[in-house]
Design a protein with these regions (language model features):
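Cleavable N-terminal export/targeting peptides
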Residues: 1-24, 204
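A generic structural micro-feature
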Residues: 47-49, 101, 135-137, 188-190
Length: 204
C-alpha cells in the first residue's frame, strides 16, 4: 500500500468521524462454529471444526437519522484452539425490515495475526519437515465482509447470528518445529475463509 492510498483511507475515516450524525460503540462476544478455509495457491481445503470464542470492540459512525450508512473500525480477539488478534475497518450498511430483525453488513480491510499450537506438519505439504506437530504463526492482510442478523433487538443488548467471509491476499506463515522457526513461502497465496457464528451485541 503506497503512502497516497494510506493517507487517503485515513482522511476518509477522519472526515466520516467528524461529520457523522451518530457514533456507536459496540461490544461483541460470540462463538464461532467452524472455519472453512480454502487455499487457492495449493488447492487445499480445511474444516477446523469448533474454533472458540471472539470478543471485539467496534466504533460505528453513521450518517443521517436512519443510520443506513457509515463507517466502522473494529479490534477483535479470538481464543480457543488458536489465538488471534485483528484490526478491521471499512464501510457499514444497516437495514431494519421490521422491529424483530436488523441486518448489518460491514465490508472491511483487515490486518490480523493468528497463532495455533500442535498443527499437523503434513498439512504444509513438505516431506522435509517429517511428521508430528508444529506451532504455527500467521500474519494476514486482506478484505472481507461480516454480516450480522440482530434478533429481538433492543437499545442495549441484542442476540445475533452472523457470517464472516474473508479473503487474505497477503499471508505469511511461520512454523516452529522442535525449536526451529521455518518460513513458509507461498507464491500467489490466496486464502478464502467462511465462518458462521452466534453471539450477543452490547451497545454503549
Amino acid at each position: 500500500m503506497n503512502k497516497k492510498c494510506f493517507f487517503g483511507i485515513a482522511a476518509l475515516f477522519f472526515f466520516s468521524a467528524a461529520f457523522a450524525k451518530k457514533s456507536d460503540v459496540q461490544l461483541f462476544s460470540g462463538l464461532f462454529f467452524t472455519d472453512f478455509e480454502y487455499s487457492v495457491s495449493d488447492n487445499r481445503f480445511f474444516d477446523s471444526g469448533f474454533r472458540g470464542g471472539e470478543f471485539s470492540v467496534s466504533n460505528f459512525n453513521f450518517f443521517g437519522e436512519e443510520n443506513h450508512f457509515g463507517f466502522f473500525e473494529r479490534l477483535s480477539f479470538q481464543a480457543g484452539d488458536f489465538f488471534g488478534a485483528e484490526f478491521a475497518a471499512g464501510p457499514a450498511f444497516c437495514a431494519a425490515p421490521n422491529d424483530f430483525l436488523r441486518i448489518q453488513a460491514s465490508p472491511f480491510f483487515r490486518l490480523g495475526f493468528e497463532f495455533e499450537k500442535n498443527q499437523n506438519i503434513e498439512k504444509y505439504g513438505r516431506t522435509s519437515f517429517g511428521t508430528g506437530s508444529a506451532d504455527e504463526y500467521r500474519i494476514l492482510l486482506g478484505a472481507g465482509t461480516t454480516v450480522f442478523f440482530f434478533l429481538m433487538q433492543s437499545r442495549r443488548v441484542s442476540p445475533l447470528l452472523g457470517i464472516d467471509f474473508s479473503v487474505s491476499f497477503f499471508c505469511r506463515d511461520f512454523v516452529d518445529i522442535d525449536g526451529a522457526l521455518y518460513y513458509l513461502d507461498y507464491e500467489n497465496f490466496l486464502l478464502l475463509k467462511f465462518s458462521p457464528f452466534i453471539g450477543v451485541s452490547f451497545n454503549l
